Amino acid sequence: MNNIIVGMGEALWDVLPEGKKIGGAPANFAYHVSQFGFDSRVVSAVGKDELGDEILNVFNEKKLKTQIEQVDYPTGTVQVTLDDEGVPCYEIKEGVAWDNIPFTDELKRLALSTRAVCFGSLAQRNEVSRATINRFLDTMPDIDGQLKIFDINLRQDFYSKEVLRESFHRCNVLKINDEELVTISRMFGYPGIDLQEIGRASCRERV
């Protein structure tokens, strides 16, 4: 078995007032892991379009290994605008390529060689990518030192209690910030307790 570290989920373009740049938490995770000299992969999907080709070219230029399928959906974009106070507002396009990541034979082979994977909630907003992520997690060999990192990304209304609970069950590492802890506490009925205890309660959802 290899010690491959995977970032799985959305790979997209953030379209900012000053121009576009590649975004997506899983892609960023895989890139930063690679900068420490580890063998990483980005697993996602892009469209058969110019924006998709650009993403693949940028990753290739950065020498970032990928397993990205080109599918019959447009490459994902996030339109970023600033309100009157300079706070960014995000419009995440739906029905895009990373909503439709296929589970291929090649992806199955990668799962069998993966030591750690980081996945989020945003890429599970569509049942196709959600099923692929869960199948990848289930295919990974059950060995000591294996990491299944759930990076909660509560964006717009692209999450549900059921999807979050399922991911709690499948992960063994949970990445969550204070703001997300408050949202989780309301969703799962933990009001009136401190953030540390909310974190413990969230972890108990795995049991």
Residue spans for each PLM region:
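Substrate-binding N-lobe of the ribokinase-like
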Residues: 4-5, 14-87, 94-101, 105
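Short beta-strand/turn micro-motifs composed of small residues
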Residues: 9, 44-46, 152
